[in-house]
Amino acid sequence: MALDPQSILLTDRVAVVTGAAAGIGRAIALAFARFGAHVAVCDRDADNLAVTAREIAAAGRTAVSAVLDVREPELVRRFADDVRARLTAVDVLVNNAGGGFMAPFLDVSEKGQDALVRENFGQVSHCIRAVVPLMTTGRGSIINITSIEAHRAGPGFAVYSAMKAAVASLTKSLALELGERMIRVNCIAPDVIPTPGIGEVAVKTPLPRAGHVDDVAGAALFLASDLSQFVTGSTLHVDGGNWAAGGWHRGATGFTT
């Protein structure tokens, strides 16, 4: 099979991106549009989501936009119904929405823990259940945005880390369950990506720079395209080498632990 330069394009495919008002979600949605996809986006931030939708339209692609909380399964189902009515089928789902707060595990209340579970795991399952029935083209791709914290200890973020690890595990199971439908399921695990939610990040990575949201968007573009059509059940680490470093950090005189 000879590789075709057109294989990176998403011409006239349909993508759904959650948490698309800013940061990584917006970058992915806009990259998909620039590479040819029509994009349905959702977020709780109405003003910034409208900006994302306008930029998708400016790229000459159809934008479907919905202000909603993906933690609510009925709202997610309605959004999926709207996408079906407007765009017929879905080729790509990016589960980007999520969030957390820093606190020692023993200081996290039951209410806080339940919120973290809903925010970082429950909503992913809602979106997958709602969108998979729309993946009827024989080339589906589900991309779950996790974190380096899914693969290492996360002191101060214990429940958040556990939920990201749960999504990584779910990804592997669904890669097997959905494979016969030709739906691929993969993760992207970012680190040191400054976004509006986390501020500046110190640069101690093997690659001596902070990441950019477009670094994650590029990985998502690969996983959405035909270039990755034999890739499923995997995690792509977009972290400047931090996962590989395993505790080593770049300093003024070299690497230290």
What are these regions, as identified by a protein language model?
Residues S147:
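Residue(s) in the substrate-gating loop at a strand-loop-helix junction
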